[in-house]
Amino acid sequence: MEKSKVAASTKANNLAGYIAGAIRENGVAELKAVGGGALNQAVKAIATAREILAPSGIDLATVLAFLADIKMNGEARTAITLTIYAR
């Protein structure tokens, strides 16, 4: 499964819909966030997706991991991957 890139400008509700759909279809969703704003949107989306899936009896668990330093616009940045599982 390909990691969905999250930006600070990503709408959390739209991302929550993506997460809920991926969980229903595959049981897992993967996100990649670079920067605090992007991580904030990802966390809000996971919380919203949990609310969307709760009536179906699906709960979520998330595993976080650092990616190696990546280059963005010539600067070294640290990315965080968020792997969301149904439980």
Predicted regions and their residues:
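Conserved mixed alpha/beta catalytic, RNA-binding, or beta-rich assembly cores of soluble enzyme
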Residues: E2-V28, A42, I46, R50, ...
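Short beta->alpha linker loops
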Residues: T10, V34-G37
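Short, hydrophobic/π-rich interface segment
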Residues: G36-L64
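C-terminal edge-of-domain segments
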Residues: A54-R87
